[in-house]
Amino acid sequence: MTHQTHAYHMVNPSPWPLTGALSALLLTSGLVMWFHYNSTILLSLGLLTNILTMYQWWRDIIREGTYQGHHTPIVQKGLRYGMILFIVSEVFFFAGFFWAFYHSSLVPTHDLGGCWPPTGITPLNPLEVPLLNTSVLLASGVSITWAHHSLMEGNRNHMNQALLITILLGLYFTILQASEYFETSFSISDGIYGSTFFMATGFHGLHVIIGSTFLIVCLLRQLKFHFTSKHHFGFEAAAWYWHFVDVVWLFLYVSIYWWGS
């Protein structure tokens, strides 16, 4: 930063946006191939490309922010605005799923038997695994807040413990959600109920996996002393994202599991 006369980060040319776009193309094309032809070659290639891109892109950002000092207060302010806009876009993404659900459930057509859940669908009991999942995510929201406060106070041990607890709760939620999918009496192809249920809860599960990965990276960085009480936006962004995942699940639980059953 000594050779600059301003506080802004002039990003160097990077191949990762291009490889990220390529991995997204391979992932979506691979999903189509998997769904229609039961072939996982393209999907596996997309996952591998995506993982490699994430690793190397995160590596570059950590190098720029932690070791090269490019993330000045002005740059961090821009990153915060970017993260807020990203979460807002995710809100509208899930709003589409809720719209589809309520559009179909509030005025069920004759094809659905004139009722909701549709005739022939046995919904999951909202007081069993879904309620446990809700408790797990709410507990993880408490632990991530504990981790944030510990970081602000400079308490490394509590920060490490709270962050590890949050990650374990996220993994536990993912396992419970996967086991629930195997126990359902309906599938994604069982009309509008199956489609909206698995699309909404499945994409939320994907966001939990993404958030857990985000937190694992933060834990590894915390163990390497990358975060301080005044310079920790990477963790702060992960915490915001995790709270967003918590809130979305509460709406999913109330709408699809409880009211929709």
UniProtKB/Swiss-Prot annotation:
Enzyme class: translocase
Compartments where located: Mitochondrion inner membrane
Mitochondrial matrix side: 2-15, 67-72, 153-155, 224-232
EC number: 7.1.1.9
Main location: mitochondrion
Membrane topology of this protein: Multi-pass membrane protein
Record field: transmembrane: 16-34, 41-66, 73-105, 129-152, 156-183, 191-223, 233-256
N-terminal signal peptide: none
Catalytic activity as recorded in UniProt: 4 Fe(II)-[cytochrome c] + O2 + 8 H(+)(in) = 4 Fe(III)-[cytochrome c] + 2 H2O + 4 H(+)(out)
InterPro entries named among the record's database cross-references: Cyt_c/ubiquinol_Oxase_su3, Cyt_c_oxase_su3_dom, Cyt_c_oxidase-like_su3, Cyt_c_oxidase_su3-like_sf, Cyt_c_oxidase_su3_a-hlx
Biological process terms in GO annotation: mitochondrial electron transport, cytochrome c to oxygen; respiratory chain complex IV assembly
Keyword set, alphabetical order: Membrane, Mitochondrion, Mitochondrion inner membrane, Translocase, Transmembrane, Transmembrane helix
GO MF: cytochrome-c oxidase activity
Family per record: Belongs to the cytochrome c oxidase subunit 3 family.
PANTHER family: CYTOCHROME C OXIDASE SUBUNIT 3, CYTOCHROME C OXIDASE SUBUNIT III
Free-text function comment from the UniProt entry: Component of the cytochrome c oxidase, the last enzyme in the mitochondrial electron transport chain which drives oxidative phosphorylation. The respiratory chain contains 3 multisubunit complexes succinate dehydrogenase (complex II, CII), ubiquinol-cytochrome c oxidoreductase (cytochrome b-c1 complex, complex III, CIII) and cytochrome c oxidase (complex IV, CIV), that cooperate to transfer electrons derived from NADH and succinate to molecular oxygen, creating an electrochemical gradient over the inner membrane that drives transmembrane transport and the ATP synthase.
Subunit note: Component of the cytochrome c oxidase (complex IV, CIV), a multisubunit enzyme composed of 14 subunits. The complex is composed of a catalytic core of 3 subunits MT-CO1, MT-CO2 and MT-CO3, encoded in the mitochondrial DNA, and 11 supernumerary subunits COX4I, COX5A, COX5B, COX6A, COX6B, COX6C, COX7A, COX7B, COX7C, COX8 and NDUFA4, which are encoded in the nuclear genome.
Name of the molecule in the record: Cytochrome c oxidase subunit 3
Organism for this UniProt entry: Rattus norvegicus (Rat)
Gene name linked to the record: Mt-co3
